[in-house]
């Protein structure tokens, strides 16, 4: 359908969270494939729809523009200009690295959030009221992430093969942490916790931390 209506000078972009599949489809089916430059603005919230629009949503947030081997450099510059005009910081990235990076920084955290809520439900089936009443801090923040659109996240999980590797790595580290706690290994536990604190500090220094987190 796009092949019938697209003009020669038309610029197309998408804002999906995974890139491998959409780029494969684009390169296979679109005549003017060089007119399609894929984007991924790293901004959003757990709510969706026009009623939740936010004029400052992209302000000072990263937007990844996907760099392929064969591409129209003028179109990349034009798309970069567009994202910068609405406040984004632009970075170029190839589709393979994009899907690997965001399987860890975005997709895995959401998966963990969904599973944590399931775990909390399973452990409190008799005392659901208590679960809700005392969900301050950690669980409440995770529940915000788990409130994200389930259809969108189903598609993200199914379209990024890297999520399985991310889950395996997370499981490996979780089992390691479990053994440390079982063995009451004070030194190793403090080291793990301290290291996580340092990474958190680095994230803040890179201005990736905001009052209302974006995922």
Question: Over which residues does each language-model region extend?
Answer:
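Short, flexible, solvent-exposed loop/turn segments with mixed acidic/basic and small polar residues
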Residues: 52-57, 152-155
């Amino acid at each position: 359908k796009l092949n019938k209506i697209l003009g020669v000078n038309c610029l197309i972009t998408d804002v999906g969270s995974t890139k491998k599949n959409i780029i494969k489809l684009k390169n296979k089916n679109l005549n003017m494939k060089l007119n399609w430059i894929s984007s991924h603005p790293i901004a959003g919230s757990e709510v969706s729809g026009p009623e939740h629009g936010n004029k400052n949503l992209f302000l000072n947030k990263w937007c990844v523009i996907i760099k392929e081997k064969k591409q129209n450099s003028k179109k990349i510059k034009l798309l970069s200009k567009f994202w910068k005009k609405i406040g984004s910081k632009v970075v170029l990235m190839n589709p393979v690295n994009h899907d690997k990076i965001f399987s860890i920084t975005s997709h895995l955290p959401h998966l963990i959030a969904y599973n944590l809520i399931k775990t909390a439900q399973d452990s409190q089936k008799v005392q659901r009221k208590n679960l809700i009443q005392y969900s301050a801090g950690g669980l409440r923040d995770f529940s915000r992430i788990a409130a994200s659109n389930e259809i969108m996240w189903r598609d993200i999980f199914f379209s990024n093969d890297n999520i399985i590797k991310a889950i395996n790595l997370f499981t490996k580290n979780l089992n390691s942490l479990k053994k440390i706690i079982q063995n009451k290994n004070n030194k190793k536990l403090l080291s793990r916790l301290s290291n996580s604190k340092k990474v958190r500090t680095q994230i803040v220094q890179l201005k990736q931390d905001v009052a209302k987190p974006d995922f």
